[in-house]
Structure formats: structure tokens, C-alpha cells
Amino acid sequence: MARKPVELDFESTLAQLEAVVTELERGDLPLESALKEFETGIKLAKQGQERLQQAEQRIQILLQKSDTAPLTDYSADE
């Protein structure tokens, strides 16, 4: 059953996206239902990405207003 994404917090968005992925991975949905689930998943992924970008912007603003160390890119090699 296709879910309608509404404005959710990040954790709820991620949980719904995981449910959509699980349902699609089962592979037993009719084509039309699978397409609706896929569309819902795309919308949820976009919503989650937007939430992450907003959080990153807030962190950057907070760091600029404080006297803490500058924000640097993460590198797994370090």
C-alpha cells in the first residue's frame, strides 16, 4: 500500500523509507503498486535529504556564531 509522505521528522521519514524499501525488496507487489511505492520512496528520500541539509546549515550557522573550531570535511582516511 502506497504511503503519502507528509512533513515528518527525520527519524520518521527514514523509518517510512525503510518500510517502503522492505516492501519493494519482497518483490510480491503488482507492478502498479510497486510503482506507487517507488514514487513514495523517492519523495521520502528527497524529504530526508532536505532535512539533513537543513541540519547541516543550522550547524554551520551555530559554529559561525561561536568561537569553536571551524567545520571541516570528514575523511574516513584520517
Curated annotation (Swiss-Prot):
Record localization: Cytoplasm
GO molecular function: exodeoxyribonuclease VII activity
Any one GO cellular component localisation term in the record: cytosol
Assigned EC number: 3.1.11.6
BP-aspect Gene Ontology terms: DNA catabolic process
Record InterPro entries: Exonuc_VII_S, Exonuc_VII_ssu_sf
Pfam families linked to this entry: Exonuc_VII_S (PF02609)
Catalytic reactions of this protein: Exonucleolytic cleavage in either 5'- to 3'- or 3'- to 5'-direction to yield nucleoside 5'-phosphates
Keyword entries, A-Z: Cytoplasm, Exonuclease, Hydrolase, Nuclease
Top-rank lineage group of the source organism: Bacteria
Chief location of this protein within or outside the cell: cytoplasm
Database matches in PANTHER family: EXODEOXYRIBONUCLEASE 7 SMALL SUBUNIT
Stated family: Belongs to the XseB family.
Role this protein plays: Bidirectionally degrades single-stranded DNA into large acid-insoluble oligonucleotides, which are then degraded further into small acid-soluble oligonucleotides.
Self-association and partners: Heterooligomer composed of large and small subunits.
Protein name per its UniProtKB record: Exodeoxyribonuclease 7 small subunit
Taxonomic path: Bacteria, Pseudomonadati, Pseudomonadota, Gammaproteobacteria, Pasteurellales
